[in-house]
Amino acid sequence: LLSEDYNIRISGEDVERGTFSHRHAILKVEDSEEEVNLLNEYPGKEGRFAIYNSLLSEYAVMGFDYGYAMASPDTLTIWEAQFGDFANGAQIMIDQFLSAAEDKWKVQNGLVLLLPHGYEGQGAEHSSARLERFLQMCAQENMTVANCTTPANFYHLLRRQHKRHFRRPLVV
């Protein structure tokens, strides 16, 4: 997507490194503490990759990202929960805006929620994103809920999310 001149924005708690050390999007130079965003350094890149560690306020950050996705529909805007169950802190945003805004106000939004879930050694509460709650909110094609099984699935899901001609929230 970056090589096709699309912008990508990711925010959430510890997203630069990834809670499970799965991303390493920002590297620090040991001597100078300079931060290097590798995805903005590769040749042929046209778009901008912005990644921001956020404060521990899911409600505020998801609200900001929802507004950002609304104001900048040409940017793939992603909010990642540090653990899947952390979406609880933003439940009002999910209920009132993410799942219902198109029906209520006839506005579309393409915000992507990444909700890590699985047994990562952090205990039962952190191990479930409670996807069943998102499935219960699905009605009249108001959002997409997906559980990818391969990296290729994930790539094509994000690509489709950004390249289609309408916007709908995506929960992964």
Residue positions per predicted region:
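Phosphate/diphosphate-binding loops
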Residues: L76, A81-V172
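Non-catalytic terminal/interface segments that mediate subunit docking, oligomerization
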Residues: L1-D74, A81-E102
